[in-house]
A protein has these predicted regions:
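Hydrophobic packing and interface segments
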Residues: 1-210
């Protein structure tokens, strides 16, 4: 491909078909199955913990399923909101906003389902602090996504210009050794904020729901 000067993903290169098949199997089907497995595993784990706890009743066992259903509906609405947001100039911002829309709908649906007050008895009778923990966890997840976008993207995140990728590109001018060193240093540095966020999320969730 390089010697003949054929562009990337050109149909004249027979290897493109195999490459696209691999992309779909690994990046789409494989990643989707992995996310689904993690999602279902977390729901089942929460249900087992609730079932084995003497302080929690049947409502706590049903809560992960109910919140998962609300999350599904919110995610579908968030995906379809892309048809409205895609007309903007910033594609990255549009994708980011779909996440925010889905998260807000999920939080609203979760609180309405659990809240005992003006709306009367919630669908299930659980402590509202548990929902605070759920919201905190989703906030941490979104924040980690924004940090990842900062360290792996080239577009500004909420007006903050990323310096990681341009720095690696600048270091690459002097050779592969500095490229590897810069990439390794940025990669290691990029894990610092997510670690702090996860730790804060664990302590916060224990405070609200523990």
């Amino acid at each position: 491909k390089v010697e003949a000067g054929i562009p990337e993903d050109d149909p004249r290169n027979p290897g493109v078909i195999a490459d696209n098949v691999g992309d779909n199997v690994g990046d789409v089907a494989g990643m989707g199955a992995d996310i689904f497995e993690s999602f279902v595993g977390s729901i089942i784990a929460a249900m087992i913990i609730a079932d084995n706890s003497s302080a929690m009743g049947a409502d706590y066992i049903m809560m992960p399923i109910m919140l998962g259903l609300i999350g599904y509906v919110a995610s579908i609405i968030g995906v379809f909101s892309m048809f409205i947001l895609k007309n903007g100039k910033d594609a990255a911002a549009a994708l980011r906003n779909t996440t925010f829309i889905a998260a807000l709908l999920f939080w609203l649906g979760g609180y309405i389902s659990l809240y005992e007050g003006a709306l009367g008895q919630g669908l299930i009778d659980v402590d509202i602090g548990v929902m605070h923990s759920v919201v905190l966890g989703s906030v941490v997840g979104i924040a980690i996504g924004l940090v990842t976008e900062y360290y792996t993207g080239i577009e500004p995140v909420f007006g903050i210009k990323t310096k990681a990728i341009p720095h690696i590109g600048e270091m690459s001018k002097t050779g592969p050794a500095t490229n590897a060193i810069a990439g390794l240093s940025v990669g290691m540095m990029s894990t610092f904020i997510p670690i702090l966020l996860i730790a804060a999320g664990i302590f916060g969730a224990n405070h609200f729901g523990g």
